[in-house]
């Protein structure tokens, strides 16, 4: 992968707001659009360095897809905004959204193609076979959707929990996993789900992908998501033998659809959105026990990085991000985080003590791609805000900031990336973006609290 493409989405819940009329939703959306556009424009991606280009700056502007859906006190959508930033839209572009759907048909999303990204193919000549959703050839905007990396594990979790809800298995159903000829042992389904979400464990993900194939869930997953108008969320090409086969250009997610999936997981009452075919989507698409289980795992996800920076708390190269705490299960007595095999080595206690929100989320990162998405909720006593934020990008660990540049070794293909030496996995532009978006939502929450005195009361 070459330059970067990122995609971010966010959904805000404002306790105390009443469900809006269509006209007020449009008005709130207009202000949210401009605030979100301003947050994106305020982040300077031009100084980001590229290990694959021997530490040179980015060759082109990054792709950034940001969407926000604001919610009322109980979690009903009241406003939405979506902004694209790319080499096509270097100053950002607001995406037209459809009220009540909180979706868009104004963007032609195409599958990720590394050769198109790095210039070996034409940037603008993708054929209809590359469309993620058909029928958008004449859409006014276009965007090549970055590979979601381990963020796609939320789709695997959704598929498994749909099978649980349909009575095809339970969270305590034992599953013995063999990958080809390799025996990986037996655990209950929940025993595979936990490490897949909280530590982003690939082996656990392989087990659940294979389970979905064996039980017919994988064959249904894309169709079920498409029926919810989440058609850009797709898992294709995985192996029914090993559970692997996770490839760019085959597994797809976009920010707005990712945010709406997290909106569903969050579980507000009543109508969440209406599909183009008139289906009314509610939180009951996933049962309350399944949503509660998944939210519990997301709350315990250990990688407080990407849109936040708590795992590298106190590092001179860290920038403020979403003000979250690292789950205690990953901390030693000195507050240092170890998540799976990732040792971060910083005392996170000062940042944990200063946390303002909890973040129920899933991250993902490879060399070429980085992502982070989840549900943000204000902690007690903090300025009320409640939203979902989703970021999908090509800002993988090959991209880094000037402060860690001395650690880069361009002759060492395995250990020469700055992340190996510093433990700073993401460019801090993403944490800065998380911080700026949270400040927008914090200000909107404070304004709503003034208008509605019960705003900060738990519903």
Indicate where each model-derived feature is located.
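Short glycine/serine- and small hydrophobic-enriched flexible loop segments
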Residues: 158-166, 210, 260-267, 435, ...
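Active-site SXXK
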Residues: 146-175, 389
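Bacterial N-terminal signal peptides
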Residues: 5-15
């Amino acid at each position: 992968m070459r330059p970067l493409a990122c995609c971010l989405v966010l959904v805000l819940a404002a306790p105390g707001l009443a469900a809006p009329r269509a006209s007020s939703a449009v008005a709130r959306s207009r202000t949210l659009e401009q605030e979100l556009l301003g947050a994106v424009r305020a982040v300077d991606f031009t100084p980001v360095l590229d290990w694959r280009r021997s530490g040179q700056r980015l060759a082109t502007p990054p792709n950034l897809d940001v969407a926000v859906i604001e919610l009322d006190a109980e979690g009903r959508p009241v406003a939405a905004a979506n902004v694209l930033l790319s080499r096509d839209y270097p100053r950002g572009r607001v995406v037209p959204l459809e009220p009540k759907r909180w979706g868009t048909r104004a963007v032609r999303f195409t599958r990720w193609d590394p050769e198109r990204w790095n210039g070996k193919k034409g940037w603008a000549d993708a054929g209809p076979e590359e469309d993620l959703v058909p029928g958008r050839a004449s859409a006014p905007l276009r965007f090549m959707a970055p590979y979601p990396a381990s963020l796609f594990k939320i789709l695997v979790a959704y598929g498994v929990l749909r099978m649980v809800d349909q009575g095809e298995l339970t969270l305590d159903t034992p599953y013995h996993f063999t990958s080809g000829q390799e025996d990986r042992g037996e655990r209950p389904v929940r025993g595979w789900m936990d490490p897949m979400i909280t530590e982003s464990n690939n082996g656990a993900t392989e087990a659940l992908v294979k389970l979905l194939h064996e039980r017919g869930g994988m064959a249904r997953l894309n169709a079920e998501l498409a029926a919810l108008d989440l058609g850009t969320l797709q898992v294709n090409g995985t192996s029914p033998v090993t559970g692997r086969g996770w490839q760019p250009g085959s597994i797809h997610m976009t920010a707005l659809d990712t945010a709406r999936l997290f909106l569903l997981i969050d579980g507000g009452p009543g109508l969440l959105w209406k599909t183009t075919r008139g289906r009314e989507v509610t939180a009951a698409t996933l049962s309350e026990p399944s949503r509660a289980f998944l939210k519990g795992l997301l709350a315990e996800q250990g990688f407080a990085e990407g849109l936040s920076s708590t795992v590298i708390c106190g590092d001179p190269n860290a920038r403020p991000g979403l003000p979250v705490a690292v789950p205690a299960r990953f901390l030693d007595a000195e507050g240092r985080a170890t998540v799976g095999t990732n040792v971060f080595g910083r005392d996170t206690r000062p940042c944990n003590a200063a946390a303002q929100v909890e973040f129920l989320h899933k991250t993902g990162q490879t060399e070429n791609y980085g992502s982070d998405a989840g549900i943000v909720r204000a902690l007690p006593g903090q300025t009320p805000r409640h939203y979902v934020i989703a970021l999908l990008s090509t800002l993988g660990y090959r991209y880094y900031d000037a402060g860690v540049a001395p650690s880069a070794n361009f002759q060492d293909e395995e250990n020469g990336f700055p992340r190996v030496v510093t433990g700073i996995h993401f460019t801090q532009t993403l944490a800065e973006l998380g911080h700026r978006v949270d400040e927008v939502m914090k200000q909107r929450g404070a304004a709503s609290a003034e208008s509605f005195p019960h705003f900060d009361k738990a519903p």
